[in-house]
Curated annotation (Swiss-Prot):
Annotated family: Belongs to the Fur family.
Annotated organism of origin: Yersinia pestis
UniProt protein name: Ferric uptake regulation protein
Gene Ontology cellular-component annotations: cytosol; protein-DNA complex
Gene from which this protein is expressed: fur
A GO molecular-function descriptor: DNA-binding transcription factor activity
Annotated region described as Dimerization, given as residue ranges: 85-142
Keywords recorded for this protein, A-Z: Cytoplasm, DNA-binding, Iron, Metal-binding, Repressor, Transcription, Transcription regulation, Zinc
Amino acid sequence: MTDNNKALKNAGLKVTLPRLKILEVLQNPACHHVSAEDLYKILIDIGEEIGLATVYRVLNQFDDAGIVTRHNFEGGKSVFELTQQHHHDHLICLDCGKVIEFSNESIESLQREIAKQHGIKLTNHSLYLYGHCETGNCREDESAHSKR
């Protein structure tokens, strides 16, 4: 049994071809933060005939099962990434949609300190920082970031 088959079974999901193919694409580093529409286009490009409705349904199932994490970045478009064991935060370009993951212990420590000052014990958090690429011409290069 492959690792992907085990992952699906451990999540309580039946092993189906669409689920396996979508999981394979999500494991590609170039598809780290991907929308349902972009995932659908990638599947078409590699010759997989999986409908857009199926892609949405599988991503929702994966989200419910904890296999993927859904992010609703500025602009209203959901993007998905495989759920990771390590915590990280995100920088997002408002022009091209580029997503950069980062970890910074100073930020994490400050968040815990602020929560403690207010009598809150943190269990989870999300930090999204929005801005614009310094190059200034990233809109022209939008396709380079659409599959991240």
